[in-house]
């Protein structure tokens, strides 16, 4: 039994597209994820964990709180695709341990396959401090302006700005800063930073004192940027030229 944890339906969908002969597989995900897989006719999917198949994909809703019953200790794989899905990062100190804890009968092995992205944008604690302070100032100014003006145009634009902005995810239902949501903001950025360096990610695993850790780094003939270009961005002619060039390079290796 193999259990694969990846918080990206697009990444999971790509497995089915790239390995069409993949059989005995099921994806456990949200209703939205099920719809995307259904549109692509991608094997079995479920919102509830029932009987496991030989290969089982899980999105983040199954990272914690839910026991996963397996007839035998499974091989567990984490996948973090930093070029196609930055939300697929996994925190070694929390999520990785929580996932393993879901298997009450233990696991056979744990493997984390991750791409490292040195140019990944992530904020330091100081930068987050500045962002929150600046966003709070602007947001509160909007609210003050709204109480002072009776001009319909001003009120309309201020209400639109107050009702939809990037500061709202860190406020509670009363419009006040939510300490838990803000703390989560810091944590997410710290975890993203781990994936800018192999050393940072490996050190994070070692510091948990939970895993018997070993590391293997592989440089692939086709980079993630090239893979994304082939899949999405290039015109057919350019895509074909890139594929031919990479095949020629691989023959010389």
Residue ranges of predicted features:
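Conserved SF2 helicase motif VI
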Residues: 83-110
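Short His-Asn-centered micro-motif
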Residues: 5-8, 57-60, 79, 113-116
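Conserved helicase ATPase core of P-loop NTP-dependent helicases/translocases
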Residues: 32-59
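Flexible, charged surface loops at secondary-structure boundaries
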Residues: 1, 20-22, 44-53, 68-72, ...
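Short acidic, S/G/P-rich loop/turn micro-motifs used as interaction or catalytic elements
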Residues: 9-12, 32-35, 62-66, 81-89, ...
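Conserved strand-helix element at the start of the C-terminal RecA-like helicase core
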Residues: 1-20
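The feature captures the C-terminal accessory region of ATP-dependent helicases
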Residues: 130-253
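SF2 helicase motor core recognition
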Residues: 54-76, 96-106
